[in-house]
Amino acid sequence: MKYGKIRIEDGFLVFTRHMMINNLPCKDIVWAYMRKEGTDEGDDRQLSVNYLVIVTRRKKRYKFDMTEKEIHECIRILKILNPDMATGFPKGGRISLQSLPNTRDLGAIVTADDRHILPRRLLRSGELYHISESDKNRLREEYNLKTVIDLRSAEERKCKPDTIMAEVEYYHVPVVDEDVQVISNREQFVKMLAGLPDDIEEYMIRQYRNLCMDQLVLKQYARFIDILFRQEKGAVLWHCGTGKDRTGIGTAFLLSLLGVEEDVIYEDYLRTNRYMEPKLVYMQRLVQTWPEADEKMTEKLPIIYNVKEEYLAAVFETVKKTYGSMEKFFQTVFYLKPKMIEEFRNKYLI
């Protein structure tokens, strides 16, 4: 099968480089994606060119220009020949699932040393209680989901248990196991809103700061990282309730451990606001119809579905003040020496 200047024959990607024919085993390709260069907009009109980018186990990159149709077909065939190959360039974006609004692939997020997280390996999410059959199938088949880490409390899991998927291993790593209020009906929801303080931002900053000073909480995040460290194949998905606070802090620790710069970590953290906006708007309209709910309750709703940069900043500031740096934090709390950190990075970066 020929695609532009390359062809696939007998499990090999065949192409010419420097007047020599190369036979690259398809099994050696770890990542394939489409990249578009140039623009056809504005006064400086340039030809827009599509490229198939191939990354190998030896971290070599090859780029081939071809049509968009050829690229998609080529990636499809490569995926059949090598099911473990990562595809796409999500850059931390949302996975377009029907039933899960805040499930994201951290793949293609760039690190400070210009490496990328491999796509379809690290997935952050909200709860899986209402996951649809089609979404389950997609996570298993397209993302090769092998492990789910539930960061919720035992009571939360009892109220809204994860939907069990075949051939997926489940871990319960409760970051906070007692203080999380479980909401299962309208009366409890109203009571929860009424109980939130008026200085809600300061309250959340204190909550975040307290979380990263609690040794039991940090022990659970260390366990979360340990599970990722031991993962051999397939994708890992971790989640809490809405996928913003406990998941957000854990993801920030993970991205920092992988060498991602803080401004990029904040970008990932704040994406929750975009993906949870429809749910927030719906709940604001709904609560306004409840006679027992007042205006203050409606104003407090964003705290359930939104995050702010100041919350995560409190985590980084507290950790650095307590341990001196993120590196010392990882060594002291997660027991990860520099050699182990590099081993962890080599597992998930390319």
PLM features per residue range, with description:
Residues 3, 9, 31, 41-237, ...:
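Cys-dependent protein tyrosine phosphatase-like superfamily
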Residues 5, 9-39:
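Phosphoinositide-binding peripheral membrane targeting modules
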Residues 14-16, 55-57, 241:
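A generic structural motif
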Residues 242, 246-247:
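Ser/Thr-glycine-rich phosphate-binding loops at phosphate-binding pockets of nucleotides
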